[in-house]
Amino acid sequence: MNRQTPAQLSAAPEIIVVLGGGMLPGGTPAPATLARAEAAADLTRSHEDAAIICSGSHGVGRKPRRSEAASMADLIVERGIDRERILLEDESRDTIGNAVHVTDRYLAAIPARPMYLVTSPFHLERSLETFRLVLGPAWEIEGVASAPAPDDGERARHEPRFLMQTRAFLAGIAPGEVARMVAKLRKAPPR
């Protein structure tokens, strides 16, 4: 997969970030991951100059052979999108990790620009707030909902608790203080 330098990434007028939604025990993408990748592929067709960042290692459980990010990238390429446009962030295991690692690896070194954040409908509020807390107000972030997955209703029940955990984790850290966020994430993951 292409690991563009920030200088190459900065040429893209817009960025699409798609968040993984889990992997099944056999190592295949969960329905939420597939739906999110489909939505990202659809969005990419109408934003021909945007760079795409697929974010996610895996959620709970053992690490599969292929990350959520790599699996989503493969699906997006199968939908006709050039692989050279796709970047991977494959360390994160949750939404805070998505925001911190995407920012640390790719976004911190480039000027702010419009960004589309693709995730499940139930996950939009928390993911948008998390990325805004990490990146700060200079970044114009728009949420894009994928089609719902069969387990979205069950997963949505946990969102208020996860949002409180996110706010607590990032409390006292200013947007853009990525090194502090990375250090805190490595020291005490929010899970």
What are these regions (language model features)?
Residues 1-159:
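A structural signal for short, hydrophobic/glycine-enriched beta-strand patches
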Residues 150-191:
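C-terminal capping/extension of enzyme domains
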